Amino acid sequence: EVKASKKWDHEQVVELITKVNNYWQANNKPEVRAFWDNAAYHTGNMEVYKMLKDQKMLDYSIRWAEHNDWTGATEANPAKWKYKPYGEGKQHVLFGDWQICFQTYIDLYNIEAAKGNAAASEYMVKRAKEVMHYEAYSEPTDYWWWSDALYMVMPVMTKMYKLTGDTKYLDKLYDNLLTTDEIMLDKETNLYFRDGKY
């Protein structure tokens, strides 16, 4: 039997989350790229903001989004967009490591839209809409060929559905997930391998 060494109350948990998040923000500037290694933090920071309503935390993610012009990978020509093999360049627009940033951009947009600023804030989700619409209406279903993509892009698809009302995002999520299951899901353990190479 596993027992926790300490019972935490709500205030203690909030205090610890605040302490850790404040430390992170004090020691890491937000002016960094929108790739997964930075973007994953912002998905958590947005959840902390939703819980605590601390404007300083929200401002940190806004500065990061503004630094990246509300984009992921920046290639403008869809004919040059790719998602494999692995790459960190501007042409990897369809690669989930460059799409996780859209989770935060959509969250930031929704905050503004709730204040009645939807039209004035459309720039926040313009690139997300462009990229994810393209992907949702494309034929491939093997976009998520490594397990991290499930955390990175599945939420983007559900957020895009909620943002637009277009069920194609849910259809694409389902189709992509079926392919992911085929290439990575271990049927005995019901756990995912790291990627399709295993």
Each predicted region: which residue ranges?
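Extracytoplasmic mature domains of secreted/periplasmic and thylakoid-lumen proteins
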Residues: K80-G87, Q91-T158
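Solvent-exposed loop and edge beta-strand segments that line ligand/cofactor-binding
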Residues: D9-H10, T18-M46, K50, D54, ...
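Long, well-ordered core segments of solenoidal/helical folds
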Residues: E11-E31, D59-K82, A119-T141, T167-F193
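Well-ordered alpha-helical scaffold segments within catalytic/enzyme domains
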Residues: V2-K6, A40-Q55, I100-N117, M152-D166
